[in-house]
């Protein structure tokens, strides 16, 4: 049957069955069964009619339509209740718009918070926040507390959505920004909403004070209960106001707004214990006739927006539990506090490290977006005050001290040299901003994007080498004792190597590699990337020292006083040390995997449609766009890692001994680092047990066993603890 013409589209009856709908509506229905069958007779057996208006998409939709498993709209036919929108519920008397009791307010507010969090975790507004009917149109609400709260939630959603859209570090699995045509309280200003919340807060505070117990007075249980409930509503309203004010603060361009947000976050954190302790005071879901996880209580209707969803939308959004809501908010507050700390950093390298460390915690999309918009404000300046070009120049000075950026150098005031370096620095801005933005994406997407940005850095590397050569030629004419070789090139190469290392290591975190692939990933890291990184860091350190010597000689010429030489801590020494530790860990894992393979402890797949070479080339494919360091192709790798070139070729016991030495070396390097951070301690938790296990294996422990070992990545994401089974 088809619907020929609609006379009256009645929304309220959409949950009725088909025959009931036909009886109830004024729609003119036409039976097309006979016409359809006659048309089909004209087709021969096996013949299909392909109309240009009926392609694969329409065919799939036809299969899905009205199938309860695939058509979200069919859910309405499976529930035993009438699905009402806000206006209908008010008429029906199933929802209160005034004189809400304190337990009702607490229950509705808590469920709204749960819906808000579920939305931030990637579900749609239609299935989360807008299942609360009060949010649909706060103008209808007469209860001041409920009205202010509903407007507050709408404003929080609106600003959060704007922030996430502006930062553009989300993918479809992270965040749904569609508002489905709902009004986001745009007719009311942010200031008015915070004012309304403050009025309710003050009113509740008065009630809290008036019901407080007095010394020597016998306590009435009812008054005590009212006191607890008033305190619960007060805490929730204040928390909403503080959270909204924090998001408003992040929309300001001034850095002082971040300090304001920091103070407010402390206030928000203090309210969480009161919210947690009063969860039981709120009304709970009365019944659950939808077979889903969504609580059904006054003011909520999980199916109210079902018609707004695409036909094959997931049936239910699993709304988080109230107990989890408080701990989620606690973590969100901690993340926002961390975001506020970024404005204290001045060096581009430190900012980049901050973004990497923040990303490692897999933060939510809102905190990732706030970090991005705090770093690069609307005016395209870092923190709204610094030019990105100046940040790049400072990073160059602190890393390689290029003569062209030294005020005492001839090139500093040379117009041609100035144009060269300024042009190069301007070209650096886009790739570095993109790199920082990549660290705002979720971990899985980051890896893919790191592979692509290598192309931009390869182009930058090429330009850096050309600029270095041009500046070196200019410098030799005026100051022959100075060099400008590989200064800018060293700096870009350093970032190139960091991206390549991060790309490979993230594969362990995302569990992309099979056990039989570990050996060539760890080989590439230890023998190639970390070796290049350490020589790059040493070259940068050498450039710094050469520039410092020239500066000291110039100072000596001017001052006749003898200055006491203090032992200076080299700026890159810690990074060089950490790279040595990482290289030893990778070398240890490579030799461990080769030895396990010799002992038959590594299960390899029977390659049919691919081979080890195909897998190897796929793993390192993004590196083909990079000229320096040149990519190591599979045949080169096999040749370089071939043990038969040694005489005699080492056997598994020797390899276990060699691996144990690498783990021991990493352990010694890390134990000598002053003020070890979390990363140092995490690697030590792997290096120590692996050293012991390698010693056991070298001594012949479980030599005959062919059971594959276990690799436990719980202590560190990139280096597993080897466990013998």
From Swiss-Prot:
Nucleus listed as a keyword: no
Lineage of origin: Eukaryota, Metazoa, Chordata, Craniata, Vertebrata
GO BP annotation list: negative regulation of apoptotic process; smooth muscle cell proliferation
Role this protein plays: Auxillary component of the N-terminal acetyltransferase C (NatC) complex which catalyzes acetylation of N-terminal methionine residues. N-terminal acetylation protects proteins from ubiquitination and degradation by the N-end rule pathway. Involved in regulation of apoptosis and proliferation of smooth muscle cells.
Disordered, as annotated region: 548-573
CC annotations in GO: cytoplasm; cytosol; NatC complex; nucleoplasm; plasma membrane
Gene for this chain: NAA35
Localization, UniProt: Cytoplasm
Entry keywords, A to Z: Cytoplasm, Phosphoprotein
Entry-linked InterPro entries: Naa35/Mak10 (IPR007244)
Disulphide linkage map: none
Subunit-level organization: Component of the N-terminal acetyltransferase C (NatC) complex, which is composed of NAA35, NAA38 and NAA30.
Name by which UniProt lists this protein: N-alpha-acetyltransferase 35, NatC auxiliary subunit
Biased composition (Basic residues): 558-571
């Amino acid at each position: 049957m088809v619907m020929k013409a609609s006379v009256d589209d009645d929304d309220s009856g959409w949950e009725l069955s088909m025959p009931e709908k036909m009886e109830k509506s004024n729609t003119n229905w036409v039976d097309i069964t006979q016409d359809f069958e006659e048309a089909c007779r004209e087709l021969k057996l096996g013949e299909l009619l392909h109309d240009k208006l009926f392609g694969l998409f329409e065919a799939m939709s036809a299969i899905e339509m009205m199938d309860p498993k695939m058509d979200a709209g069919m859910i309405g036919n499976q529930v035993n209740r009438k699905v009402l929108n806000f206006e209908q519920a008010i008429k029906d008397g199933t929802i209160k718009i005034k004189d809400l009791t304190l337990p009702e307010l607490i229950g509705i507010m808590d469920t709204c918070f749960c819906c808000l969090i579920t939305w931030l975790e990637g579900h749609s507004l239609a299935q989360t926040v807008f299942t609360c009917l009060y949010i649909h149109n706060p103008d209808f609400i007469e209860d001041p507390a409920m009205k202010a709260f509903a407007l507050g939630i709408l404003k929080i959603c609106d600003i959060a959505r704007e922030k996430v859209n502006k930062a553009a570090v989300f993918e479809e699995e992270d965040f749904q920004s569609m508002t489905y045509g709902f009004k986001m309280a745009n007719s009311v200003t942010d200031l008015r909403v915070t004012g309304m919340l403050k009025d309710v807060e003050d009113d509740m505070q008065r009630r809290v004070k008036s019901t407080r117990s007095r010394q020597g007075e016998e306590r009435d249980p009812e008054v005590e209960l009212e006191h607890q409930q008033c305190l619960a509503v007060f805490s929730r309203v204040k928390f909403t106001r503080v959270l909204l004010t924090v998001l408003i603060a992040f929309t300001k361009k001034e850095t002082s707004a971040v300090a304001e947000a920091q103070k407010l976050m402390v206030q928000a954190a203090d309210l969480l214990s009161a919210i947690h302790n009063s969860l039981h005071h709120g009304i709970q879901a009365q019944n659950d006739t939808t077979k889903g996880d969504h609580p059904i209580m006054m003011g909520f209707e999980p199916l109210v927006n079902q018609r707004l969803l695409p036909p094959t939308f997931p049936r239910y959004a699993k709304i988080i539990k109230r107990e989890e809501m408080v701990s989620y908010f606690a973590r969100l507050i901690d993340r926002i506090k961390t975001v506020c700390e970024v404005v204290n950093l001045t060096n581009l390298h430190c900012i980049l490290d901050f973004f990497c460390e923040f990303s490692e915690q897999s933060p939510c999309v809102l905190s990732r977006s706030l970090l991005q918009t705090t770093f690069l404000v609307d005016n395209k300046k870092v923190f709204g005050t610094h030019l990105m070009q100046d940040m790049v120049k400072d990073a160059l000075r602190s890393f390689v001290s290029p003569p062209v950026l030294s005020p005492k150098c001839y090139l500093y005031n040379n117009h041609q040299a100035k144009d060269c370096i300024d042009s190069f620095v301007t070209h650096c801005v886009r790739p570095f901003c993109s790199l920082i933005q990549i660290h705002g994406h979720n971990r899985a997407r980051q890896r893919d994007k790191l592979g692509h940005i290598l192309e931009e850095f390869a182009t930058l590397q090429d330009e850096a080498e050309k600029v270095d050569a041009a500046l070196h030629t200019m410098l030799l004419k005026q100051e022959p004792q100075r060099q400008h070789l590989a200064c800018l090139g060293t700096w870009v190469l350093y970032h190139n190597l960091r991206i390549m290392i991060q790309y490979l290591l993230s594969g362990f975190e995302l569990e992309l590699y099979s056990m039989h692939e570990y050996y060539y990933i760890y080989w590439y890291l230890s023998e190639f990337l970390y070796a290049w990184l350490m020589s790059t860091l040493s070259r940068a350190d050498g450039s710094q020292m050469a520039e410092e010597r020239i500066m000291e000689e110039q100072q000596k010429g001017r001052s006749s006083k003898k200055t006491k030489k203090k032992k200076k801590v080299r700026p890159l020494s810690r990074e060089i040390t950490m790279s040595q530790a990482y290289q030893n860990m990778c070398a240890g894992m490579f030799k461990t995997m080769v030895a396990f393979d010799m002992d038959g402890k590594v299960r390899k797949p029977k390659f049919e449609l691919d081979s080890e070479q195909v897998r190897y080339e796929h793993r390192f494919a993004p590196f083909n766009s990079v000229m320096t360091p040149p990519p190591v192709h599979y045949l080169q790798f096999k040749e370089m890692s071939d043990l038969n070139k040694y005489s005699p070729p080492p056997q598994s016991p020797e390899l276990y001994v060699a691996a144990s030495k690498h783990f021991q070396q990493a352990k010694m390097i890390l134990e000598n680092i002053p003020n070890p951070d979390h990363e140092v301690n995490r690697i030590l938790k792997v290096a120590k047990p692996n050293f012991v296990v390698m010693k056991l294996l070298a001594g012949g422990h479980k030599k005959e066993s062919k059971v594959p070992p276990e690799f436990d990545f719980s202590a560190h994401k990139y280096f597993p603890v080897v466990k013998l089974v």
